[in-house]
């Protein structure tokens, strides 16, 4: 029996692209996008965010604890994963839920 993996379209918001350039080189960014396209439920749902997810992604030599956090939203019915924010753990532990809810509202209206 063949094994079928569904891949999703990954959409990088302008904010994500700007922030990603501060956190990753092109190879690291491509590796993450490939991973999340194949594993759209990899992160944990952020409580109170309306369904946004946060995944921890390790950096070379620092692992997940010293790596980055990516906030994203699945629109799996549309076959889409929206990458919203990326930040280093050393920069911030969590994004306030009211900010995340506003981001999700804007994505739903897009």
Region annotations inferred by a language model:
Residues 8-12:
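Short acidic alpha-helix initiation/capping motifs at coil-to-helix transition points
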Residues 60-62, 73-76:
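Short polar/acidic secondary-structure junctions
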Residues 1-7:
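Short, intrinsically disordered or compositionally biased N-terminal tails of bacterial proteins
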Residues 27-35:
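Short, solvent-exposed recognition patches
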Residues 74-110:
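Enriched for short, Lys/Arg-rich terminal
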Residues 66-70:
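Short, surface-exposed coil-to-beta transition loops
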Residues 34-64:
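A short, surface-exposed loop/turn module that caps and links secondary-structure elements
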């Amino acid at each position: 029996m063949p094994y079928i993996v569904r891949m999703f379209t990954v959409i990088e918001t302008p904010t994500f692209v700007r922030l990603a350039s501060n956190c990753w080189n092109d190879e690291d960014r491509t590796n993450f996008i490939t991973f999340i396209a194949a594993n759209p439920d990899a992160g944990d749902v952020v409580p109170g965010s309306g369904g946004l997810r946060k995944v921890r992604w390790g950096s070379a030599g620092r692992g997940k604890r010293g790596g980055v956090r990516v906030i994203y939203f699945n629109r799996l019915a549309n076959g889409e994963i929206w990458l919203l924010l990326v930040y280093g753990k050393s920069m911030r532990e969590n994004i306030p839920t009211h900010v995340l809810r506003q981001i999700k509202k804007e994505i739903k209206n897009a």
